């Protein structure tokens, strides 16, 4: 009987503690538990990587200084437009399944050409592509854009296509359309499921170097970090621009960010690594910018902003010579280039138009950065001028846009860190409530209650005597007659068995009531279960089979011990 009472008290105490929001007060020990979580658990004074002679704090400072000018630069008429074939056939598998039918997946193309500046008009674009030198083949037309745009007198020299890390002819196809990037921002579209998982699985498993290969050279490790940082940067953008279905507004989603990025310090680190790689590529072409300074087609203000951005970068931000220092060979370099070119082609298999657009832009930007860093021979000035001179306008736009995406990712990481801190220290801190009302604290308080109950059961008579004695001391000034103690008759064993019988009867009745209520609730439970199955089947039918599972239903209950 006493044990049953104690167990009942335990259950009641546990339920009360679990459902109360203010059961406990946060202690220093709880605060230490918060500090041990994995959000950006990186020493900001450490270097980003062995090939980067710059710390996380230094990159944050650089990004803060250039952020305004970079944002204005990317919104200018020259850099905010991009040309792309959105419906190029996937060359890896049949990608007709899993189409994203959400309006957020679509892309708004430019139809009113009259609103475009002169250098984006069709006849101007056509002249750039057609007025080429006779000795060059058609595939080199677009590569000579910057030379023609700036009316340089230097004759271009033919160069093999083997230096490209992406297919530069993707932007001149007959099905290519012009897109205003400011009207199609990168944000959460709801695209996901098995098809999206297949994209990243193919990139990591079939194109990244294997675990046995990585660690043997910085080049192979750098390839994986580029892909991982690219993936993490996309996740950060989607977390920042997430549709709140209750308010209808696009706003940051801390829970989604934590589930995808915040709990994984290596992913945050790889984003900073990518930032350093692209920044060094921009710094490396700075001496050649006057040679294709857009010939007065871009106003002076935009030129100044571009100079302000690149001038604050430094050569120490990334040492590309160290990446291939010990194993620079044509075979490894060709393999590196071939694998990354495959990554850019895999973007054609993405069935969300908006996702494909930004995937192609950013992979093209990374490909351009790699070409600048690894194909320009510092000892050969002629080769440097030649490679930079053959950059297409789309490569240059993609390079700046990719740097802008990484800049926004770095800014978003710091923003999410502040949001995370406010949640930990806020009055409505559900994560704090988890640590304060966790199962072990509940058991601790329940154990106290059990001990108290058992002590009361075992010392009822002693408790009464102590109470009477304490009362006599409290009212010592009153002369009260002593109460006459009349012994009550005790039936002994009879009362004991009677109480036990009544208790067991009540338990049986309660069990029958539980079974009865379960049968009453059965139709409703079957209806809800069937509705959920139909809902999942419908999502699978329209191509978003795992859409529900990607949302964090219990966002605060992440596994903070994940490495």
Curated annotation (Swiss-Prot):
Induction (free text): By unfolded protein response (UPR).
Signal peptide coordinates: 1-18
InterPro entries (UniProt xref): Ero1, ERO1-like_sf
Name of the protein: Endoplasmic oxidoreductin-1
Keyword Membrane: yes
Cofactor(s) needed for function: FAD
Subunit structure comment from the entry: May function both as a monomer and a homodimer.
Disulfide bonds: 90-349, 100-105, 143-166, 150-295, 352-355
Entry annotation: catalytic residues: 352 (nucleophile), 355
Originating gene: ERO1
Biological role: Essential oxidoreductase that oxidizes proteins in the endoplasmic reticulum to produce disulfide bonds. Acts by oxidizing directly PDI1 isomerase through a direct disulfide exchange. Does not act as a direct oxidant of folding substrate, but relies on PDI1 to transfer oxidizing equivalent. Also able to oxidize directly the PDI related protein MPD2. Does not oxidize all PDI related proteins, suggesting that it can discriminate between PDI1 and related proteins. Reoxidation of ERO1 probably involves electron transfer to molecular oxygen via FAD. Acts independently of glutathione.
Any Gene Ontology CC annotation: endoplasmic reticulum
């Amino acid at each position: 009987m006493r044990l049953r009472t104690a167990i009942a008290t335990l259950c009641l105490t546990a339920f009360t503690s679990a459902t109360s929001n203010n059961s406990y007060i946060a202690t220093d020990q709880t605060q230490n538990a918060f500090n041990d979580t994995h959000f950006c658990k990186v020493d900001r004074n450490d270097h980003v990587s062995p090939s980067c002679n710059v710390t996380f704090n230094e990159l944050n400072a650089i990004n803060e200084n250039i952020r305004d000018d970079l944002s204005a630069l990317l919104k200018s008429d020259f850099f905010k437009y991009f040309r792309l074939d959105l419906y190029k056939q996937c060359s890896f598998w049949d990608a007709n399944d899993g189409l994203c039918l959400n309006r957020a997946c679509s892309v708004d193309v430019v139809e009113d050409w009259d609103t475009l500046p002169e250098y984006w008009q069709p006849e101007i674009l056509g002249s750039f592509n057609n007025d080429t030198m006779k000795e060059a083949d058609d595939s080199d037309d677009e590569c000579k854009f910057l030379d023609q745009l700036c009316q340089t007198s230097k004759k271009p020299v033919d160069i093999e296509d083997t230096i490209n890390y992406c297919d530069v002819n993707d932007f001149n196809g007959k099905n290519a359309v012009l897109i205003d990037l400011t009207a199609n921002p990168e944000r959460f579209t709801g695209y996901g499921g098995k098809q999206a998982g297949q994209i990243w699985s193919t990139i990591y498993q079939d194109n990244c170097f294997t675990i046995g290969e990585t660690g043997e050279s910085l080049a192979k490790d750098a390839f994986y970090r580029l892909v991982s940082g690219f993936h993490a940067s996309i996740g950060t953008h989607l977390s920042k621009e997430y549709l709140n279905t209750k308010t209808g507004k696009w706003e940051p989603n801390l829970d989604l960010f934590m589930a995808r990025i915040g709990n994984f310090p290596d992913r945050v680190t790889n984003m900073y690594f990518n930032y350093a790689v692209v920044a060094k590529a921009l710094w490396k072409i700075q001496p050649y910018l006057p040679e294709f300074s857009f010939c007065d087609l871009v106003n002076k203000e935009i030129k100044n902003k571009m100079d302000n951005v690149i001038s604050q970068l430094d050569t120490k931000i990334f040492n590309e010579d160290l990446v291939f220092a010990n194993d620079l060979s044509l075979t490894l370099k060709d393999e590196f280039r071939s694998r990354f070119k495959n990554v850019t082609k895999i973007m054609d298999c993405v069935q969300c138009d908006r996702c494909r657009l930004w995937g192609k832009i950013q992979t093209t930007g990374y490909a351009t950065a790699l070409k600048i860093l690894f194909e320009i021979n510092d000892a050969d000035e002629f080769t440097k001028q030649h490679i930079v001179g053959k950059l297409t306008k789309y490569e240059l736009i993609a390079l700046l846009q990719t740097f802008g995406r990484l800049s926004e990712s770095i800014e978003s990481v710091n923003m999410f860190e502040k949001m995370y801190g406010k949640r930990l220290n806020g009055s409505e801190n559900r994560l704090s409530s988890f640590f304060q009302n966790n199962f072990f604290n509940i058991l601790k308080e329940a154990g106290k209650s059990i001990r108290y109950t058992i002590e009361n059961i075992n010392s009822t008579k002693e408790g009464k005597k102590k109470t009477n004695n304490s009362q006599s001391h409290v009212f010592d000034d009153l002369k009260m007659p002593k109460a006459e103690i009349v012994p009550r008759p005790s039936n002994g064993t009879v009362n004991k068995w009677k109480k036990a019988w009544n208790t067991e009867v009540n338990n049986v009745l309660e069990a029958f009531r539980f079974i009865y209520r379960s049968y009453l609730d059965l139709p409703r439970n079957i209806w809800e279960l069937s509705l959920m199955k139909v809902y999942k089947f419908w999502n699978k039918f329209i191509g978003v089979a795992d859409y529900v599972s990607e949302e964090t239903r219990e966002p605060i209950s992440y596994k903070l011990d994940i490495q």
